[in-house]
Amino acid sequence: QIAGWSTRRSMTYDMNHHTNIVREVQFNTWRTTPNTGLIVSFDANSNSSIHPGRKSPVGDRSARWALSEVYGAMDATRGKSLQWRGPVYQSMEKEKDRIRITFEEGSDQGLRLERADARGFYIAGEDRIFHHADARVLGGRDVPAMVEVWSDDVPSPVAVRYAWSNLPLGSLMNGKELPAYPFRTDKWPLKPHYGEALYEVSP
């Protein structure tokens, strides 16, 4: 996936930036096209260049995909295919004033938050206004892991987005330290912009 970037000198975090659409299209292409893979790279960039500043994570993740999907490499410690995917969003469920997110089996092993501030999560109500959210991991071992997301500013949430920005911030990964793919639970039309131009895009 395209790395995080900004055309401005200062680091700006824009949920309506067109790069969010690019990442979503890349994700959907991967999911519908045989013999393809998709590597997360937004966490390998910390500057305004569109090219990842840290090459090693991108190379390692790409090699994992090739070893697993092309050469059939196995993880000797698990007796299963070599893990190459980070957590992949599967479904959401509302629980009172919180939303619980589940991830595809096999991508969620060892699910954890790298940082205590759980950065990268946003939550919205029916007004479709997103607020920074708190998050924590539930379950594990014999119980499928999930992430619970909430915000005091959103008493009745209906949607969650994660790492949804031109410069995504994220903290969610699995036990192999592979980062979660950016995702959104909503299907609301998007209004990304490039410079001063606005576009409306339906999923």
Segments and roles (model prediction):
Residues 2-7, 43-46:
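Solvent-exposed loop/turn segments at secondary-structure junctions
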Residues 4-17:
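Serine-dependent acyl-ester chemistry module
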Residues 13, 42, 193-194:
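Conserved, single-site charged/polar hotspot
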Residues 13-14, 53, 133-138:
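Short, contiguous acidic/charged loop-to-helix segments that flank catalytic cores in large enzymes
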Residues 23-120:
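Catalytic cores of secreted or luminal carbohydrate-active enzymes
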Residues 106-203:
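C-terminal beta-sandwich/jelly-roll accessory domains of carbohydrate-active enzymes
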